[in-house]
Curated annotation (Swiss-Prot):
Tree of life domain: Bacteria
Any single Gene Ontology cellular-component annotation: cytosolic small ribosomal subunit
Gene it is expressed from: rpsC
Record-linked Gene3D superfamilies: 3.30.300.20, Ribosomal protein S3, C-terminal domain
Skewed-composition ranges (Basic residues): 227-239
GO terms of molecular function: mRNA binding; rRNA binding; structural constituent of ribosome
Pfam families: KH_2, Ribosomal_S3_C
Basic and acidic residues bias spans: 215-226
Sequence similarity: Belongs to the universal ribosomal protein uS3 family.
Every KH type-2 domain range: 39-107
NCBIfam families, per database record: rpsC_bact
Disordered: region residues: 212-239
Subunit structure as annotated in this protein's UniProt entry: Part of the 30S ribosomal subunit. Forms a tight complex with proteins S10 and S14.
Protein name (record): Small ribosomal subunit protein uS3
Length: 239
């Protein structure tokens, strides 16, 4: 059996950027990595109703900058900025550092794969028909201007004894093309029969020249280049 590589991890440094941007030594790396996981876990729990699509984390010394990409920024900010102030205090208490929390709105939620997967999972939990939910999701994505979309649901669909997979797709979803800008999202639908997995792939178009060329070492100028002397060749004259 073949397995699909993670479409975002496959394109890191080419068409996608890292969600955690910082450097640490060997001793501190694992602690900061676990800290990032705790930050994301807290935000996913608190901002689920706001439509959380992505969390970016940057570090510099004892300062942490967290940027949340959400569909409903008003839910994060709260009345008079009360909600975001409480979240900032919770993150500072969790990390023990100075935390700057920034909010960025997702312009079109239908073109964000994590939000599409979350919406399908919510519909399944409310006992929507699975085929109808995934077909409507793909149709909304295509109407929003995507080049292609694919939604997959796996598990005990409809309470069946044997797990199966349902999927719907439109357009192109070239997973092996590195210049293809593909967004990927995953969500869980917790039902009375068990947990169903929802995957969403959205093809947003190709990024021409997305890969950054490697910097070539600068050569010294012609005047500065050391000249190599060729060894003199002695030719014997024939007598």
């Amino acid at each position: 059996m073949g397995n699909k590589i993670h479409p975002i991890g496959f394109r890191l440094g080419i068409t996608r950027d890292w969600e955690s941007r910082w450097y640490a030594g060997k001793k501190q790396y694992r602690h900061l990595l676990l800290e990032d996981q705790r930050i994301r876990g807290l935000l996913e729990k608190e901002l689920y109703s706001a439509g959380l699509a992505r969390v970016d984390i940057e570090r510099a010394a004892d300062n942490v900058a967290v940027t949340v990409h959400v569909a409903k920024p008003g839910v994060v900010i709260g009345r008079g900025g009360e909600r975001i102030r409480v979240l900032r205090e919770e993150l500072a208490k969790l990390t023990g550092k100075n935390v700057a929390l920034n909010v960025q709105e997702v312009q079109n939620p239908n073109l964000s794969a994590p939000l599409v997967a979350q919406r399908v999972a919510e519909q399944i939990e409310r006992r929507f028909a699975v085929r109808r939910a995934i077909k409507q999701a793909v149709q909304r994505v295509m109407e929003s201007g995507a080049k292609g979309a694919k939604v997959i649901v796996s598990g005990r669909i409809g309470g069946a004894e044997q797990a199966r997979t349902e999927w719907a797709a439109q357009g192109r979803v070239p997973l092996h093309t590195l210049r293809a800008n593909i967004d990927y999202g995953f969500a869980l639908a917790r039902t009375t029969y068990g947990v169903l997995g929802v995957k969403a792939y959205i093809f947003l178009g190709e990024v021409i020249g997305g890969q950054k060329p490697k910097a070539r070492p600068e050569l010294p100028k012609a005047e500065e280049r050391p000249r190599r002397r060729r060894p003199a060749v002695r030719v014997k004259k024939e007598e």
